[in-house]
């Protein structure tokens, strides 16, 4: 990575201890639209631009794993027209952006109950996964129709269905039945939009994660906020239960 393409933080020569896996709770699209006197759908459109810029910025920082929480299992309770419009937007964006991300060497995967999503979105996600499956750069996980409790329940059901002896069940085995199988635990969780909760997100994988909360709404989240989050993380001492 040449100095011309490095983010400002690295160009200043600061040495940082960067996270290996960053997960982001994308929040604030609707409120952003309301603040600007726009329909909520416009907030989602603006949020897509933040997704695009954030992925590219984190890729420049050489963050190996990035997970985006875009639609939870609880979000089905929102107005149907808003949910359907969001799905149509996601289908279009996944198809379009997967081509660009493929050029950057990004590997795409999905976390959640894919089979419950609309057929068109399922197909777009599967195309993106197939296109990028051999890439060795950043692994970008898209958590669409994801819920932490649902993930754990699905893992338990799969273990029971396979007849795994109880004495054989340990954390390592259990990890292999989660949606995130093969991914490392999350080092840093970023939540935009000012809420101070995890919203059923990666509750198994985030047992020792660091958190960064910001009042900035997702469409306004950019390189400066990423810099703040990484600086905050780098200044922390992670003890993992020790001294």
Walk through the language-model features, giving the residues of each.
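Flexible, compositionally biased loop and terminal segments
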Residues: 1-243
């Amino acid at each position: 990575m040449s100095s011309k393409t490095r983010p400002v933080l690295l160009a200043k020569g600061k040495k940082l201890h960067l996270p290996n896996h960053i997960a982001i709770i994308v929040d604030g699209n609707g409120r952003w639209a309301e603040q600007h006197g726009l329909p909520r759908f416009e907030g989602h459109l603006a949020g897509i631009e933040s997704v695009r810029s954030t992925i590219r910025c984190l890729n420049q920082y050489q963050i190996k794993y990035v997970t985006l929480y875009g639609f939870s299992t609880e979000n089905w309770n929102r107005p149907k027209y808003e949910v359907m419009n969001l799905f149509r937007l996601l289908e279009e964006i996944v198809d379009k952006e997967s081509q660009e991300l493929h050029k950057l060497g990004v590997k795409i995967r999905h976390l959640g109950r894919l089979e419950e999503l609309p057929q068109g979105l399922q197909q777009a996600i599967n195309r993106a996964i197939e296109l990028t499956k051999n890439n060795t750069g950043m692994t970008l996980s898209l958590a669409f129709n994801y819920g932490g409790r649902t993930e754990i329940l699905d893992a338990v059901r799969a273990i029971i269905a396979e007849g795994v002896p109880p004495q054989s069940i340990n954390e390592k085995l259990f990890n292999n039945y989660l949606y995130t199988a093969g991914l490392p635990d999350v080092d840093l969780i970023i939540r935009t939009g000012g809420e101070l909760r995890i919203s059923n997100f990666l509750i198994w994988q985030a047992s020792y994660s660091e958190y960064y909360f910001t009042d900035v709404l997702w469409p306004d989240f950019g390189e400066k906020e990423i810099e703040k989050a990484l600086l905050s993380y780098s200044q922390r001492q992670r003890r993992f239960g020790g001294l």
